[in-house]
């Protein structure tokens, strides 16, 4: 774990919503992007619990403390690899999932939970921007067309 006191030093922050009149004219994200520094602070709030209930709260069993730690340490490439270890489509699930992992976060017992959903979305966005996500082609040619 990168910062053992991150959850004490930093409160939960969420990205700002874009104004509704602006959002009505495009199909872009509802929230403004987080800065890298703000996201690292949020990732540092992960307590690396002995039994991380966020993993059990996630329907996919994502290794949430692992990629929170990697984001805190600025190891984005390893973070997307850790995310892809349990989730083939984080670009969809990160946005559509209602984040039961945040409800299961141990920090959420006494304070606001870690912003797990936002960290996941930002990992994926960074991976797309850096060109780390590439299509995986089938090894065997099937004659089935979609």
Predicted regions and their residues:
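Non-ligating segments of multi-cofactor redox enzymes
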Residues: 1-29, 36-43, 47, 117
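A short, ordered amphipathic alpha-helix with a cationic face
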Residues: 12-17, 32, 52-57, 69, ...
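Ferredoxin-type iron-sulfur electron-transfer modules in oxidoreductases and energy-metabolism complexes
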Residues: 23-41, 63-95, 99, 110-140
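Short cysteine clusters
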Residues: 46-49, 54, 58, 93-97, ...
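Short alpha-helical linear motifs
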Residues: 103-107, 141-142
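Conserved small/polar residues in nucleotide/adenosyl-binding loops
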Residues: 144-146
